[in-house]
Structures are given as C-alpha cells and as structure tokens.
C-alpha cells in the first residue's frame, strides 16, 4: 500500500485494499438474525430447515400491520402451526427491534409480495395509489439496502421511481403527524 498516513491521498489500489462490509443500526446484523433463530429453535423447537420460512413469514406479516413493537399480529406462523407470530415477535425484542429485523428481510418481503401479487394490506388506507401499492409498508427503505439480505436471484424487479416517491412522501407525512402532538402542546403553552 502506497498510502502511509491517513492524510496521504490514496490510490485506487489502496482503496481497493479495504474489504468493507456495510452495517448500520437501522438493519439487524446477520449475527442478530442468527441469535433470533437460535432463540426460536431452542424456545419453540422449530427445526432449522423451517427457521428461514418463519423469518420470512413474520416479516411479511409485519408488512401488513407495521413494523413496530406496538403492532398487533394475528395467527400462527405459516412456517409452523402452533407457534404464534406474536410469540416469535416477542423473542425478536431480546436481540433487536422489530423494525431492524424487518429491514433485514425487506428484499425477501418485496419479492414475496411481487411474486404473489399481494401488496401490503394497508396500502390503500395509507394513501398509496395503485401504481405504488407495493411500496406501502413502513420498512420499504430496506429494499435495496446494502445491509439487508438479498435473495440469491436478486429482486424480481427494483422499486419504480413512483414507488420510491410515494414511500418517501408517506414517510414524511407520518413523521409530521407523529411530531404534531408535541408541536401542538408547545404552542398551547405559549
């Protein structure tokens, strides 16, 4: 490596010597996902070959109701009868947030929805239009995220510009709506 100090301009060869792996606090790490599935296997006796299906099913269910600890899940995991999605979600909270878990599987959820032609359940209620309905889930930011798990065959298709814009707009509206009560209370004190 020709670069000898942090202030020496690096060559492209020097830069290529760095083997960087993307990580962020907004997406669960592979180690956190492994810890979650280990907890599930031990607690609920879920066979190893079913664990990926349980992850995908749970993340897909959160796409319908929102990826929050306050979200209400119903039913058993489609991967294993007798184990409720609610039980699986509780075990996630030991290792990371629900949103971080879902962000890790966003690309998988995206492909599931496109393949089954089934958008998130609340897309219309959230104000998404027909052409952007598949972006109507709150962890859509995980689609194409470098720290999210990518399907072996890639995405069925990437998000369209309309889907990206619709999600960004919905996100800003939600942030404004969530901030309004605080702003409103401050104004009442004036």
Curated annotation (Swiss-Prot):
Q: Please name every pair of cysteines joined by a disulfide bond in this record.
A: none
Q: Under the GO molecular function aspect, what terms does this record hold? A: structural molecule activity
Where does the UniProt entry say this protein principally localizes? Answer: virion
Q: Tell me the superkingdom of the source.
A: Viruses
InterPro entries per the UniProt record, alphabetical: Pltvir_coat (IPR000052)
Q: Where in the cell is it found?
A: Virion
Q: What does this protein do?
A: Required for genome encapsidation. Forms ribonucleoprotein complexes along with TGB1 helicase and viral RNA.
| Protein name as it appears in the record | Coat protein
Q: Which UniProt keywords apply?
A: Capsid protein, Helical capsid protein, Ribonucleoprotein, Virion
Q: Which Pfam families match?
A: Flexi_CP (PF00286)
Record's family?
Belongs to the potexvirus capsid protein family.
Cellular component annotations (GO), alphabetically ordered: helical viral capsid; ribonucleoprotein complex
């Amino acid at each position: 490596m020709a670069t000898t100090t942090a202030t020496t301009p690096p060559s492209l060869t020097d830069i290529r010597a760095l083997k960087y792996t993307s990580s962020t606090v907004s997406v669960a790490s592979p180690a956190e996902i492994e810890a979650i599935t280990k907890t599930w296997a031990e607690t609920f006796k879920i066979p190893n070959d079913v664990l990926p299906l349980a992850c995908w099913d749970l993340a897909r269910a959160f796409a319908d109701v929102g990826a929050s600890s306050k979200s209400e899940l119903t039913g058993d995991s489609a991967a294993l009868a007798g184990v409720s999605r609610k039980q699986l979600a509780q075990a996630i909270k030991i290792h990371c947030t629900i949103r971080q878990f879902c962000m890790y599987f966003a690309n998988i959820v995206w492909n599931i929805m496109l393949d089954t032609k089934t958008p998130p359940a609340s897309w219309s209620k959230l104000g998404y239009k027909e052409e952007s309905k598949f972006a109507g889930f709150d962890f859509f930011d995980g689609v194409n995220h470098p720290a999210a798990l990518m399907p072996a065959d890639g995405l069925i298709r990437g998000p369209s510009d309309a889907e990206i814009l619709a999600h960004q707009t919905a996100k800003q509206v939600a942030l404004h709506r969530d901030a309004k009560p605080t702003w409103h209370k401050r104004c009442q004190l004036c």
